[in-house]
Amino acid sequence: MSEYSVFTSESVSEGHPDKMADQISDAVLDAILTDDPNARVAVETLVKTGMAIVAGEVRTSTYVDLEDLIRQVILDIGYNSSDVGFDGASCAVLNAIGKQSADIAMGVDEGDQKDLGAGDQGLMFGYATNETAVLMPAPIFYAHRLVEKQAQLRKSGELPWLRPDAKSQVTLRYENGKPVAVDAVVLSTQHSPSVQQAEIHEAVRELIIKNVLPAEWLHKDTQYHINPTGQFIIGGPVGDCGLTGRKIIVDSYGGMARHGGGAFSGKDPSKVDRSAAYAGRYVAKNIVAAGLADKCEIQVSYAIGVAEPTSISINTFGTGKLPDAEIIKLVREHFDLRPRGLIEMLNLKRPIYRQTAAYGHFGRELPDFTWEKTDKADALKKAL
């Protein structure tokens, strides 16, 4: 039997205010890494009516025109007019970025005889399951695809009344550990004042929901909740303040796996909150791809300034073809989970992060998403 009879996950679009903040933080990170791959970056963003504020700590040898960059990110998302409630061309941009603490740098930097220490203490999780082709939990996978489709139809002009802010939620029914039906789907989308609710409901149901969710999972009792509160004209940073790092479950596994609590966006790869979570996904995905388990969760923990993980644990939820203790031995043999090792293993010192900041850090097999590769699976299979 499945651990859950039903399970629900949610996602939000690139125009959601928290996701705007994530994208701005990661755009700043990318701009710095482009010229200075060894930079130390920790950037937080706040967006609210008429303003975007960035703050944090950076140590770099390069210069970035932050104001122009931030404005362009906002415009690219689709906030380009007061008619939609926010305009990247005219909003205020405030910069409160300072230098990284020398005390932190002393413990984290690499020396001639020293490995890179972890940028902070903490615990991170990685997860994979064979219930989808990309080895992600189905509820979060399809929740992402719904809001991604909303953005596609908005940007193409096919549904010109769509606006950038949107949220989705998918409830799947499980039988014997596999998803078999959609019990409920929620999609709320910002829209122009001129469109009627009936048109919104029909277009969202036919062009978004039915184009994304498997037809065999939709049934006569599936609940469709489309803009259930009625009109959704006021959205984005006007409707809600947006902050970096407030969608950590959307960013990861939709609640299907545990989370260490650290956000990803705006952090360079010396911050294990991000890099070790990516490495955890890489490890778990390769374990499942190798057939060692149907699902796998890994936890890794670190102490600030110390290279070796303080712990590595594995849980295959009774689906492992080998004991979990044996799988941990394989992980230690095939994966270097020290900060420098995982940065090199996944080639993380690159300007690749803005594209991670909307529609999921995991489960999208894009060329730059090295943590989604299954290139260790063949070697792991030999243990069977």
From Swiss-Prot:
Key words, A-Z: ATP-binding, Cytoplasm, Magnesium, Metal-binding, Nucleotide-binding, One-carbon metabolism, Potassium, Transferase
A GO MF label: ATP binding
Stretch list, region Flexible loop: 100-110
Keyword Zinc set for record: no
Free-text remark on how the cofactor is bound: Binds 2 divalent ions per subunit.
TM stretches of this protein: none
Pathway, per record: Amino-acid biosynthesis; S-adenosyl-L-methionine biosynthesis; S-adenosyl-L-methionine from L-methionine: step 1/1
Residues reported in the UniProt entry to bind ATP: H16, D165, A166, K167, D240, R246, K247, A263, K267
Binding site for L-methionine: E57, Q100, D240, K271
Reaction catalyzed: L-methionine + ATP + H2O = S-adenosyl-L-methionine + phosphate + diphosphate
Cofactor(s) recorded in Swiss-Prot or TrEMBL: Mg(2+); K(+)
Gene3D superfamilies membership: 3.30.300.10
Cellular component GO terms, alphabetical: cytoplasm
EC class: transferase
Pfam families in the cross-refs: S-AdoMet_synt_C (PF02773), S-AdoMet_synt_M (PF02772), S-AdoMet_synt_N (PF00438)
The keyword DNA damage is annotated on this UniProt entry: no
PROSITE patterns for the chain: ADOMET_SYNTHASE_1, ADOMET_SYNTHASE_2
Family matches, as PANTHER family: S-ADENOSYLMETHIONINE SYNTHETASE (PTHR11964)
Family per similarity comment: Belongs to the AdoMet synthase family.
Function, in words: Catalyzes the formation of S-adenosylmethionine (AdoMet) from methionine and ATP. The overall synthetic reaction is composed of two sequential steps, AdoMet formation and the subsequent tripolyphosphate hydrolysis which occurs prior to release of AdoMet from the enzyme.
Protein name: S-adenosylmethionine synthase
